[in-house]
């Protein structure tokens, strides 16, 4: 019933490790989790109060996210990055993993993926049926690909579209 592309995917190693550590905790083992993306910080009280104040809201939101929130994000990033970001180019989503997946499914071309990288990016590219071009990064370059390395990939075929997944840290 499932497409072969789904059947061939391996389980996420981070989710598997989290599952094993949870089982060990149930058995009484003391586990220190350093890798799972769960925030160790409490949700700020202002956010908790706003969520309470808006709990009655049950309508679908605009696809790009709330206009006021997008404007606030654009203004904040514009201030931090000394570049004028437009709220029309800001998308608010349910999480970065979902947005990265959607981007790769919609993108027609090859994905340039620095290595090491987060475990989800390559499977997302595979599900999007995109070819992956991996660039091995080094400590000397702060785990970022160099301009020359990126250029080398692109010059192999200038007629293709390329999407470079670049974030810091490379997760």
Task: Go through each PLM region and give its residues.
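N-terminal small-domain helix-loop-helix segment of the aminotransferase-like
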Residues: 2-3, 7-94
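A short helix-loop-beta submotif of the ANL/AMP-binding
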Residues: 127-132
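Conserved coil-to-alpha-helix start sites within the AMP-binding
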Residues: 96-100, 117-120
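Active-site phosphate-binding strand-loop segment of PLP-dependent enzymes
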Residues: 137-171
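Short glycine-rich anion-binding loops that position phosphate/pyrophosphate groups of nucleotides
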Residues: 39, 97, 168-171
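Conserved PLP-anchoring active-site segment centered on the Schiff-base-forming lysine
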Residues: 106-125
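Short beta->alpha connector loops at strand-helix junctions that form conserved
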Residues: 115, 134-139
């Amino acid at each position: 019933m499932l497409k072969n592309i789904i059947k061939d995917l391996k389980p996420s190693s981070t989710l598997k490790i989290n599952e094993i550590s949870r089982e060990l905790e149930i058995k009484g083992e003391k586990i220190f989790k350093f890798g799972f993306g769960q925030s160790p910080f409490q949700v700020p009280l202002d956010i908790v109060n706003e969520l309470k104040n808006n709990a009655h809201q049950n309508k679908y939101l605009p696809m790009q996210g709330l206009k006021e929130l997008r404007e606030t994000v654009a203004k904040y990033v514009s201030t931090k990055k000394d570049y004028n970001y437009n709220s029309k180019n800001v998308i608010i989503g349910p999480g970065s993993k979902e947005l990265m997946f959607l981007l790769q499914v919609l993108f027609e071309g090859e994905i340039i993926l620095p290595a090491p990288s987060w475990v989800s990016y390559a499977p997302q590219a595979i599900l999007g049926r995109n070819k992956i071009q991996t660039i091995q990064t080094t400590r000397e370059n702060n785990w970022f690909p160099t301009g020359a390395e990126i250029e080398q990939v692109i010059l192999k075929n200038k007629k293709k579209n390329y999407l470079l997944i670049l974030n810091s840290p490379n997760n």
